[in-house]
Amino acid sequence: MRINPTTSSPGVPALEKKNLGRIAQIIGPVLDVAFPPGKMPNIYNALVVKGRDTVGQQINVTCEVQQLLGNNRVRAVAMSATDGLMRGMEVIDTGAPLSVPVGGATLGRIFNVLGEPIDNLGPVDTRTTSPIHRSAPAFIQLDTKLSIFETGIKVVDLLAPYRRGGKIGLFGGAGVGKTVLIMELINNIAKAHGGVSVFGGVGERTREGNDLYMEMKESGVINEQNIAESKVALVYGQMNEPPGARMRVGLTALTMAEYFRDVNEQDVLLFIDNIFRFVQAGSEVSALLGRMPSAVGYQPTLSTEMGSLQERITSTKEGSITSIQAVYVPADDLTDPAPATTFAHLDATTVLSRGLAAKGIYPAVDPLDSTSTMLQPRIVGEEHYETAQRVRQTLQRYKELQDIIAILGLDELSEEDRLTVARARKIERFLSQPFFVAEVFTGSPGKYVGLAETIRGFKLILSGELDGLPEQAFYLVGNIDEATAKAMNLEMENKLKK
């Protein structure tokens, strides 16, 4: 891995006025810069504009070269607002791509696309920085072994298991528990795998980013007393920022994650919220650069841009980056080029259901809609595969019977169907689980359930051994032993009431 040790501020290497240009034209967030003959910067080089605007305010804008126009001119996209820039202003070619701080110093902090801290907690140690543009790991470096990434969350591990070094799409609207699920995964990877997480907020609402940060501090994922003990680094490029920043913020987060994987040899969890906004920003930049749009107005380079980001998210022999990406589907059209291109890269999908959230079943992961390429007997083993399939069949049958139950009631069902409904309701409740990060809100201690325990619990429910237990005993418990203990407590309480 190429690490550039510098003592400069993040974002750009140490500035020496070797190669100077002048602004020739400004079109919104796009600048045309003229350089002396033979001194043209390379594509993706960072350019810095420093100076003062008309009212004497200090200006410091970083841009990235996107096109060489000919006649000693380049076209660059700004990473921050271009207000106050004027034609003729001096532009410094840094001679290298954007570089951002990496390593332990980034944990517990919030950064912008340039790797500058934006949380008012002082400067960050920038002795180790890394360029945001890198090629994907070579074939020989990849770890081709298929292994399950255990999350400790029953519904995920059993029905839609994550691949170590894989990519997972997280589908869900507002208020169904996406943030809590993300925080629990960050917490569990730190405890069970000794890993760290990087969160890339790509084109999201500033309010949501702030809420996530506050909730992480409240739940202990970010340790305010000892910031180095934190388990996550946050990188934000919000909705109000120029398209250049939103297009590159995902790469900034990925670069930080790659350092933990390649140098620290850790398992890393990379969250991208929202991957659609990455495509959207690329589409805006493409239009600003004057490229001919492709289908539905998207950029012609859509697949290439997506591929260059996604191919860097992988397992190597040193460690792994497992990525969880929130996917917004425009107008619920799964054939839209943006989500359709994303699906090609995903190993698993976790779909959050508003119906389950309304029932109070958390995590509200839909067991029938969520899928995984890992759920094959040769990967997970016969026992896991058989249990998952039987759980799905039971829940599917319950779904089919719900209309009959609503019209005619349970009594009109056959004995076999009544048994299926009873077991399905127990399974549905047993798929819920108390989270560590929700302890501060719910008061019930969080539970991490190993895969073997999860399979054992569902096998016992399916076998009929627990048919005599009340269904509320299975609600918000960890393993199956806790459910039987809860059933005994409920029985004792009922006897005392009588």
Curated annotation (Swiss-Prot):
What Pfam family does this protein match (any one)? ATP-synt_ab
Q: Name one GO biological process term.
A: proton motive force-driven mitochondrial ATP synthesis
- InterPro entries in the cross-refs: AAA+_ATPase, ATP-synt_VA_C, ATP_synth_F1_bsu, ATPase_a/bsu_AS, ATPase_alpha/beta_chains, ATPase_F1/V1/A1_a/bsu_N, ATPase_F1/V1/A1_a/bsu_N_sf, ATPase_F1/V1/A1_a/bsu_nucl-bd
The protein's UniProt keywords, in alphabetical order, are:
ATP synthesis, ATP-binding, CF(1), Chloroplast, Hydrogen ion transport, Ion transport, Membrane, Nucleotide-binding, Plastid, Thylakoid, Translocase, Transport
Oligomeric and partner information: F-type ATPases have 2 components, CF(1) - the catalytic core - and CF(0) - the membrane proton channel. CF(1) has five subunits: alpha(3), beta(3), gamma(1), delta(1), epsilon(1). CF(0) has four main subunits: a(1), b(1), b'(1) and c(9-12).
Q: Which organism is it from?
A: Morus indica (Mulberry)
Annotated compartments: Plastid, Chloroplast thylakoid membrane
Could you state a single Gene Ontology molecular function term?
A: ATP hydrolysis activity
Q: Which residues bind ATP?
A: 172-179
Listed NCBIfam families: atpD
List the GO cellular component terms. Answer: chloroplast thylakoid membrane; mitochondrion; proton-transporting ATP synthase complex
Q: Which reaction does it catalyse?
A: ATP + H2O + 4 H(+)(in) = ADP + phosphate + 5 H(+)(out)
Look up the signal peptide feature and give its range.
none
Q: How does it sit in the membrane?
A: Peripheral membrane protein
CDD domains recorded for this chain? ATP-synt_F1_beta_C, ATP-synt_F1_beta_N, F1-ATPase_beta_CD
Q: What EC numbers are recorded for this enzyme?
A: 7.1.2.2
Tell me which SMART domains the record gives.
AAA (SM00382)
UniProt protein name: ATP synthase subunit beta, chloroplastic
Q: Classify the source by domain of life.
A: Eukaryota
- Give the family this protein belongs to, as stated in its UniProt record: Belongs to the ATPase alpha/beta chains family.
Q: What biological function has been recorded for the protein in this entry?
A: Produces ATP from ADP in the presence of a proton gradient across the membrane. The catalytic sites are hosted primarily by the beta subunits.
Q: Does the record's keyword annotation contain Zinc? A: no
